[in-house]
């Protein structure tokens, strides 16, 4: 097995950032759960759904950055592998959201580079703080993402089966990642950290809906 140096991981991180931020460069490994479904929408419904999916796409960009940052600084090899595997699974979400945005004649958020940079930095700091905090950070992030997804599912037009199936599968995966992180030794984060994460998340969701 090849041993990766710090330089190797930095180069890999740069490549991962480009793949997360440049539309069309991420391919899903699993089939899109929205296949074989139809979702005719009015103009206003399509605009609203596009806003929701843009927020979800930005959330997945943040998740990618979080995992990439943690994988770069994680101390234990098994934790680094956990982060890398989770990032691979999250790539499906990124691709599915991007596909849905295309179907709605919309585009990802222009602010994604900002969200990626912030999340990468937070992930790297969490990794430096220690693996139990790094895993706890993952668990809390996935909990918040799941909460957003459940809220968006309630906001979807009742006949938008395509978006519904995508978000339901994403939510299932996020909860699995949360449980995996906790079972691997993740600890509950301090209240101040949770509040900060929530504030950043709210800023991202409000701006990415429009921009």
UniProtKB/Swiss-Prot annotation:
Primary localization class, coarse: membrane
Gene3D superfamilies for the chain: 1.20.1260.10
Subcellular location: Cell membrane
The keyword Metal-binding is annotated on this UniProt entry: yes
Keywords: Cell membrane, Iron, Membrane, Metal-binding, Monooxygenase, Oxidoreductase, Ubiquinone biosynthesis
Cofactor: Fe cation
Any one biological process term the GO annotation gives: ubiquinone biosynthetic process
Entry-linked InterPro entries: COQ7_proteobact, Ferritin-like, Ferritin-like_SF, Ubq_synth_Coq7
Signal peptide per UniProt: none
MF term (GO), any: 3-demethoxyubiquinol 3-hydroxylase activity
EC number, UniProt record: 1.14.99.60
Positions annotated to bind Fe cation 2: 90, 142, 174, 177
Gene Ontology CC annotations of this record: plasma membrane
Pathway the protein takes part in: Cofactor biosynthesis; ubiquinone biosynthesis
Cofactor notes: Binds 2 iron ions per subunit.
Membrane topology: Peripheral membrane protein
Protein residues bound to Fe cation 1: 60, 90, 93, 174
Catalytic activity: a 5-methoxy-2-methyl-3-(all-trans-polyprenyl)benzene-1,4-diol + AH2 + O2 = a 3-demethylubiquinol + A + H2O
Function of the molecule: Catalyzes the hydroxylation of 2-nonaprenyl-3-methyl-6-methoxy-1,4-benzoquinol during ubiquinone biosynthesis.
Family per similarity comment: Belongs to the COQ7 family.
HAMAP family given in the database record: COQ7 (MF_01658)
Record-given protein name: 3-demethoxyubiquinol 3-hydroxylase
Source species of the chain: Acinetobacter baylyi (strain ATCC 33305 / BD413 / ADP1)
């Amino acid at each position: 097995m090849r041993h990766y140096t710090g330089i190797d991981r930095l180069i890999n991180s740069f490549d991962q950032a480009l793949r997360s931020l440049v539309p069309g460069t991420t391919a899903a490994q699993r089939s899109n759960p929205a296949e074989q479904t139809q979702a005719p929408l009015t103009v206003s419904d399509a605009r609203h759904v596009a806003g929701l999916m843009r927020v979800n796409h930005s959330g997945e960009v943040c998740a990618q950055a979080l995992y990439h940052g943690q994988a770069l600084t994680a101390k234990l090899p098994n934790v680094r592998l956990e982060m890398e595997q989770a990032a691979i699974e999250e790539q499906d979400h990124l691709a599915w959201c991007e596909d849905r945005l295309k179907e709605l004649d919309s585009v990802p958020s222009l602010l994604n580079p900002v969200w990626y940079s912030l999340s990468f930095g937070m992930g790297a700091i969490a990794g430096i703080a220690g693996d139990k905090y790094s895993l706890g950070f993952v668990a809390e992030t996935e909990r918040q993402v799941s909460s957003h997804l459940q809220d968006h599912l309630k906001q979807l037009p009742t006949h938008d089966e395509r978006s519904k199936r995508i978000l339901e599968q994403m939510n299932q995966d996020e909860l699995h990642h949360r449980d995996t992180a906790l079972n691997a030794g993740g600890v509950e984060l301090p209240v101040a950290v949770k509040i900060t994460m929530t504030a950043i998340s709210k800023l991202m969701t409000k701006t990415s809906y429009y921009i």
